[in-house]
UniProtKB/Swiss-Prot annotation:
Residue positions, PTM N-acetylthreonine: T2
Source organism per UniProt: Amborella trichopoda
Protein name: Photosystem II protein D1
Entry's Gene Ontology molecular function annotations: chlorophyll binding; electron transporter, transferring electrons within the cyclic electron transport pathway of photosynthesis activity; iron ion binding; oxidoreductase activity, acting on diphenols and related substances as donors, oxygen as acceptor; oxygen evolving activity
Gene from which this protein is expressed: psbA
Keywords: Acetylation, Calcium, Chlorophyll, Chloroplast, Chromophore, Electron transport, Herbicide resistance, Iron, Magnesium, Manganese, Membrane, Metal-binding, Oxidoreductase, Phosphoprotein, Photosynthesis, Photosystem II, Plastid, Thylakoid, Transmembrane, Transmembrane helix, Transport
Modification comment: Tyr-161 forms a radical intermediate that is referred to as redox-active TyrZ, YZ or Y-Z. C-terminally processed by CTPA; processing is essential to allow assembly of the oxygen-evolving complex and thus photosynthetic growth.
HAMAP family (UniProt xref): PSII_PsbA_D1 (MF_01379)
Note: 2 of the reaction center chlorophylls (ChlD1 and ChlD2) are entirely coordinated by water.
GO biological process per UniProt: photosynthetic electron transport in photosystem II; response to herbicide
Cross-referenced CDD domains: Photosystem-II_D1
Marked site: Tyrosine radical intermediate: Y161
Length: 353
């Protein structure tokens, strides 16, 4: 008789902690990226909620005219926002300990920089966490690649654009009205609607919505019935079953007859790759467009009106867009400068008399 004795390996506290962090058996996977994601996301969320409710007005333009953004200072859910850090701070790193007092930090919009930097770090870690979980489960990494599109867009708006413009005060205010404010100012200063990368982004977002709706409706309409006509089609399936639940050939045939034969996919993998790639590539281009316009590589402009042989202006749609842009720029930071930069940079025309 042979007895085999095995020595029980003692696992250190650090080893047990590492196993728990990287375990795929947890209800929610943590991962090493999650170790950084959780505190940064909680910090950004907590400060956002507190500042949205109670932050005092912020001197966004650096001209001693503070702007209110919180609920307790007269705003509602629609008009409220976290006001960006003051132009007086520019791009300086502005933690609480850099200010003479907490009141000064709040007056200069310190919470905005704190929220944005923690938020960007947390969403980047969330993307890394997606890759980490995919790796440990033996999956391919494309979920994290797809998520990189909104991460790139957020980074472009909250970090690259302020860097290009020279101040965090040019960042997007964190609120519903703040989003619209950035859109209007962006159009006025960069003519974003005439930028080809923005056009690709619009095609990606709206096209992705259209394709998702088409795909979902086709799948739902071509289920393989496992029940009688008197029972719900849903009763014939169980969650996670290996058998196909819908007939892609039927869906392909329907769509091919509805438009034309080659407008539909007969391969499920090709179809789902297309559904993922279309909006992701579009949003990548939008983020790239924001990043280039941050350094004033703007959309197409038609600042010179079309004139006839007599020198008379032929009014075009471009003239209307130009006037709208100038009007929006006049209203933006109206107390910080008297004229839009486009007008202030041009010499005054000479007049006879």
């Amino acid at each position: 008789m042979t007895a085999i004795l095995e020595r029980r390996e003692s696992t250190s506290l650090w080893g047990r902690f590492c196993n728990w962090i990287t375990s795929t058996e947890n209800r929610l996977y943590i991962g090493w990226f999650g170790v950084l994601m959780i505190p940064t996301l909680l910090t950004a969320t907590s400060v956002f909620i507190i500042a949205f409710i109670a932050a005092p007005p912020v001197d966004i333009d650096g001209i001693r005219e503070p702007v209110s953004g919180s609920l307790l200072y007269g705003n509602n859910i629609l008009s409220g926002a976290i006001i960006p850090t003051s132009a007086a701070i520019g791009l300086h790193f502005y933690p609480i300990w850099e200010a003479a007092s907490v009141d000064e930090w709040l007056y200069n919009g310190g919470p905005y920089e704190l929220i944005v930097l923690h938020f960007l770090l947390s969403v980047a870690c969330y993307m890394g966490r997606e890759w980490e979980l995919s790796f440990r489960l033996g999956m391919r990494p494309w979920i994290a690649v797809a998520y990189s599109a909104p991460v790139a867009a957020a980074t472009a708006v909250f970090l690259i654009y302020p860097i290009g413009q020279g101040s965090f005060s040019d960042g997007m205010p964190l609120g519903i009205s703040g989003i619209f404010n950035l859109m209007i100012v962006f159009q006025a200063e960069h003519n974003i609607l005439m930028h080809p990368f923005h056009m690709l982004g619009v095609a990606g977002v709206f096209g992705g919505s259209l394709f998702s709706a088409m795909h979902g409706s086709l799948v739902t309409s071509s289920l393989i019935r496992e029940t009688t006509e008197n029972e719900s089609a849903n009763a014939g399936y169980r969650f996670g079953q290996e058998e196909e639940t819908y007939n892609i050939v039927a869906a392909h045939g329907y769509f091919g007859r509805l438009i034309f034969q080659y407008a539909s996919f007969n391969n499920s993998r090709s179809l789902h790759f297309f559904l993922a790639a279309w909006p992701v590539v579009g949003i990548w281009f939008t983020a790239l467009g924001i990043s280039t316009m941050a350094f004033n590589l703007n959309g197409f402009n038609f600042n010179q009106s079309v004139v006839d042989s007599q020198g008379r202006v032929i009014n075009t749609w471009a003239d209307i867009i130009n006037r709208a842009n100038l009007g929006m720029e006049v209203m933006h930071e109206r107390n910080a400068h008297n004229f839009p930069l486009d007008l202030a940079a041009v010499e005054a025309p000479s007049t006879n008399g």
